Amino acid sequence: GVYLTNSLEEAHDFDNLPLFTQWLADESLAASEVKRQAPVMVVLGNPPYSGHSANKGEWMKHLLRGTDTSDHGALTGNYFAVDGKPLGERNPKWLNDDYVKFIRFAQWRIERTGHGVLAFVTNHGYLDNPTFRGMRQSLMQSFDEIYLLDLHGNSKKKEKTPTGGKDENVFDIQQGVAIGIFVRKPGVKRWTGDMAKVWNADLYGGRRDKYTTLNA
């Protein structure tokens, strides 16, 4: 089925609602069931990028910091720490960007199933910005294979091609873009210190050239 829901909000139960709102409650309950129990094996999309996130739910706030309040406070991947130690960032604002929250949600959902694929087109900031080193470590500990294609096109950084030529965005936005595919395999035993194998590539140039390469 197709459900209207806010993925970044914790799943809820609905009891004793007025009859005229029952249809909305039924849809919310169905969506909550998917969040909690359905064996979701593929999460894909192009989530919004917003450093000034309007999604300020407590569940996601704690999940980003390594605590799953939907599972009795169980410890989980912490984007605000590396090797168990706090990042110590003076301004960790960008870890609260909406696209980071959607990646964290998708990671959590695939972990609950035990295996699956996360495929997102997002802001490319998390690939190399030091603020995201806890996020990168968490993703590498959670998945077995990671495929990253940095499409660049960041006009804020005035990016150029390696030869000094013009580099354009694939969208009509200023922020650079990346494609990330994260694979968690079934039946794989994970030990402390295990990290995903990562494949990384860059794509520079004009928009049409990038489209041609992506369609090849």
Summary of predicted features, one role per range:
Residues A54-E58, E89-R90, W108-A216:
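Sequence-level detector for compositionally biased, low-complexity segments
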